[in-house]
Amino acid sequence: MSESIMDFRRAKFLISAPDIAHLNQYLPGDVGVEIAFAGRSNAGKSSALNALTEQKSLARTSKTPGRTQLINVFALDDDRRLVDLPGYGFAQVPLALKNKWQQALGEYLQKRACLSGVVVLMDIRHPLKDLDMQMIEWAVASEIPVLALLTKSDKLAQSAKMKTVNEVRSALADFGDWVKVEPFSSLKGTGKPKVLSILNEWCHPQWLMDAMAQESPED
């Protein structure tokens, strides 16, 4: 079966949940495909989601980092979902709340079998903080591919941007093919075709294609 092209503009809000337990209550089960978006609270995660789906308010943006406290789920179709995980690591968020978020993030990465890929968003000017590395390590340990997305790339000159991209790729080289690194700008659209190509690949894992082929009637 040939791989089709996913139209990410079709994304629509499905549900919000405070943690993975509540997520399991409302979703149709740990089935289909999910792609998670994770990042520090000032990494531009909501803006990236809105840019990739060409919807100005799919994910709510705020000038106050740490505003997104829930797991927000968006449906692409009956089988595929985008999951906006709580922002992590913002200093002004109370410690108890930060710990709650960290627990939810860890539970999701370790328990969600339908997770097909994780986008870890990092401000290109401040990449690979401790929590970013922890997210990447968690995902790879669970054999989940990662896209390390260096956001706000328009903030740097071309030479500085590529220097940072190459440095991050070098720092993550030990993870091999499990981790890809790409620059991205929600404002300028830089990197959008490449990111959508990776997400589309994650939306069509071989096991899902095989299952759909078995369900299709023979010609």
Curated annotation (Swiss-Prot):
EngB-type G domain segment(s) = 31-205
Question: What GO CC annotations are associated with the protein?
Answer: cytosol
Q: Where does GTP bind?
A: 39-46, 66-70, 84-87, 151-154, 184-186
Q: Does the keyword Metal-binding apply?
A: yes
Any GO BP: division septum assembly
Cofactor(s) listed in the protein's UniProt record:
Mg(2+)
Please give the PANTHER family that the UniProt record associates with this protein.
Answer: ENGB-TYPE G DOMAIN-CONTAINING PROTEIN, MSS1/TRME-RELATED GTP-BINDING PROTEIN
Task: State its role.
Answer: Necessary for normal cell division and for the maintenance of normal septation.
Q: What is this protein called?
A: Probable GTP-binding protein EngB
Q: In which organism is this protein found?
A: Shewanella denitrificans (strain OS217 / ATCC BAA-1090 / DSM 15013)
